[in-house]
C-alpha cells in the first residue's frame, strides 16, 4: 500500500527566480507526494548545505542539476521498495547515504524535498491530511493548534534593496480570536501601511517576503510608520497588535572589530551597546519578540541580551541555532535566548526538524515555524505549524502568492479542524 515505487526530482523556479529542487514520491497504491525545497538569503554559516551547480552558463551558477541527479539516482535507488510511512527510516537512509555532517554530497535541498514529498505521500496513503500525519510522526496524534502569525510588513536587510539594516519588522494580530481573523487584521494593517508610506512620499515596492521596502530615516521609523498604520486600521497597538523584529544581525556585524554597524542611520555599537539599543526600542514600542539580535557566533553577547531582555520578551535564535539540535542543546544549557526559529531546510529533513521542535518545547523554549526568503507555492510549513502545535508561524506579508499560499492553507486547516485547533494568540509568545 505505502511501498515506494518511484522517486523523481526536477528543477523548478522559486520566488526569486532561482532554481530549486522539487521532488515526487510515488507509492505502489498510486498515491503521490510532491514537495519543493525553499532557499534563504541571510543564511547561518552552520546550515546544512544547499547544493548549487556553480555552472555560470546556467542560472548564473545557481542551477540545481547536481541535487536533481542525486534525487533521481542514488536517493531513488535507496528508497524504492521502502515503506513511506516509516519517515524516520526514510530520512536516515538519505542522511547515511550522503555521509557528510552538513548534507554536502547530495545537498539539503535534495534530501529535504524528498523527505517532505515522502511525508505527503504517506499522509495520502493513510487518507489523512498532512498536518494529522505530522502530528502522528511527532508523537502527538490529534493535538493541534493554529499558529499566531508574525507578518513581515516592512522588509530590510538582505530581503530588500533599501537602507534599512534590520531585516524584518513584523506585526502579530494578538487581538484576533481565530487564525482567519488574524489574517484579516494583518491585511488591513498592510493596506493602511501602504497609505501611510505614500503620504510620506515613501516607496510601496515590496521586498522578497512581500513587505514594503522603503528607504527610511532610521530603523525606529519603521516601527513608527507601522504604529500609524495599526491606528489607521482601527486597532490598538499593544492590545490588538504587537510588534516583532528579526535583526539578522550577522548581516551587519563586522567580525574584525566586533562592531554592529547600522549603516542606514550611521550608528555603530558593541554587542552590549546594541543590546541596550534594542532594549530602548522595547521600552518605546510594544515589541514582544526579537530574532537574531546579535551575530550567530556572539554567544557572550547573547548571554547578556538574554539577561537583559529574556524575562520580558521572546528572544528567537535563527542563524544562532540553524534548527540543529546539537547547537540548540548548547543554547539551552547555557541559557541563551528562549526560543528557536524552525526552518526545515537549515537541517534538511522532516525527522530532524521534529526533533528540534521537541527539544525546544521540552526545555520550555518556544518554536516559531518559518518560511525562507526564497519560497515556492509549497505550503508544507502551514501543516507543520498545526501538526506540531508549535503556536507561531513566520511566513511573510500580505502580498506575493509564495507567502499568501501558506496563510490560505492555514485558513483551510482551521476550517477543517474547528475547535480541535485552538488559536491561542499572545499566550504562545515566550514571556507574554
UniProtKB/Swiss-Prot annotation:
- Give the matching SUPFAM superfamilies: Enolase C-terminal domain-like, Enolase N-terminal domain-like
Q: Name one Pfam family in it.
A: Enolase_N
Q: Please give the pathway this protein is involved in.
A: Carbohydrate degradation; glycolysis; pyruvate from D-glyceraldehyde 3-phosphate: step 4/5
- Which biological processes are named by the entry's GO terms? glycolytic process
Under Gene Ontology molecular function, one entry of this record is: magnesium ion binding
Catalytic reaction equation(s): (2R)-2-phosphoglycerate = phosphoenolpyruvate + H2O
**InterPro entries linked:** Enolase, Enolase-like_C_sf, Enolase-like_N, Enolase_C, Enolase_CS, Enolase_N
Obligatory cofactor(s): Mg(2+)
Positions of (2R)-2-phosphoglycerate binding: 167, 343, 372-373, 394
* Physiological role: Catalyzes the reversible conversion of 2-phosphoglycerate (2-PG) into phosphoenolpyruvate (PEP). It is essential for the degradation of carbohydrates via glycolysis.
Family indicated by similarity: Belongs to the enolase family.
State the NCBIfam families in the record: eno (TIGR01060)
Q: Which HAMAP family match?
A: Enolase (MF_00318)
For this entry, the protein name equals: Enolase
**Designated gene of the protein:** eno
Amino acid at each position: 500500500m505505502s511501498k515506494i515505487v518511484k522517486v523523481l526530482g526536477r528543477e523548478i523556479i522559486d520566488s526569486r527566480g532561482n532554481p530549486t529542487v522539487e521532488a515526487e514520491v510515488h507509492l505502489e497504491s498510486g498515491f503521490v507526494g510532491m514537495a519543493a525545497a525553499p532557499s534563504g538569503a541571510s543564511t547561518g554559516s552552520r546550515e546544512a548545505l544547499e547544493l548549487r551547480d556553480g555552472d555560470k552558463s546556467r542560472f548564473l551558477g545557481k542551477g540545481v542539476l547536481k541535487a536533481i541527479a542525486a534525487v533521481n539516482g542514488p536517493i531513488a535507488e535507496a528508497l524504492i521498495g521502502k515503506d513511506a510511512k516509516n519517515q524516520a527510516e526514510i530520512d536516515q537512509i538519505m542522511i547515511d547515504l550522503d555521509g557528510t555532517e552538513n548534507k554536502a554530497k547530495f545537498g539539503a535541498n535534495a534530501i529535504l524535498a524528498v523527505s517532505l514529498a515522502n511525508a505527503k505521500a504517506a499522509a495520502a496513503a493513510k487518507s489523512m491530511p498532512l498536518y494529522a500525519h505530522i502530528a502522528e510522526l511527532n508523537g502527538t496524534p490529534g493535538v493541534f493548534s493554529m499558529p499566531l502569525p508574525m507578518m513581515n510588513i516592512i522588509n530590510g536587510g538582505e530581503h530588500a534593496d533599501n537602507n534599512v539594516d534590520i531585516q524584518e519588522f513584523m506585526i502579530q494580530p494578538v487581538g484576533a480570536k481565530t487564525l482567519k481573523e488574524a489574517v484579516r487584521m494583518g491585511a488591513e494593517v498592510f493596506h493602511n501601511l501602504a497609505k501611510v508610506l505614500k503620504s510620506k512620499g515613501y516607496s510601496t515596492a515590496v521586498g522578497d517576503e512581500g513587505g514594503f521596502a522603503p528607504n527610511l530615516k532610521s530603523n525606529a521609523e519603521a516601527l513608527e510608520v507601522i504604529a500609524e498604520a495599526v491606528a489607521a486600521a482601527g486597532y490598538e497597538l499593544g492590545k490588538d497588535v504587537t510588534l516583532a523584529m528579526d535583526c539578522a544581525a550577522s548581516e551587519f556585524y563586522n567580525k574584525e572589530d566586533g562592531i554592529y554597524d547600522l549603516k542606514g542611520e550611521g550608528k555603530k555599537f558593541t554587542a552590549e551597546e546594541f543590546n541596550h539599543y534594542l532594549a530602548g526600542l522595547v521600552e518605546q514600542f510594544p515589541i514582544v519578540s526579537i530574532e537574531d539580535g546579535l551575530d550567530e557566533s556572539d554567544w557572550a553577547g547573547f548571554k547578556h541580551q538574554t539577561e537583559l531582555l529574556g524575562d520580558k520578551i521572546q528572544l528567537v535564535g535563527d542563524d544562532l541555532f540553524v534548527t540543529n539540535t546539537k547547537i540548540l542543546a548548547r543554547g539551552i544549557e547555557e541559557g541563551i535566548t528562549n526560543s528557536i526559529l524552525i526552518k526545515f531546510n537549515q537541517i534538511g529533513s522532516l525527522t530532524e526538524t521534529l526533533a528540534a521542535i521537541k527539544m525546544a518545547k521540552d526545555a520550555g523554549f518556544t518554536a516559531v515555524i518559518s518560511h525562507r526568503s526564497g519560497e515556492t507555492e509549497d505550503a508544507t510549513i502551514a501543516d507543520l505549524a498545526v501538526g506540531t502545535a508549535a503556536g507561531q508561524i513566520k511566513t511573510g506579508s500580505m502580498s506575493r502568492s509564495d507567502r499568501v499560499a501558506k496563510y490560505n492553507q492555514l485558513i483551510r486547516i482551521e476550517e477543517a479542524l474547528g475547535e480541535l485547533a485552538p488559536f491561542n494568540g499572545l499566550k504562545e509568545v515566550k514571556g507574554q
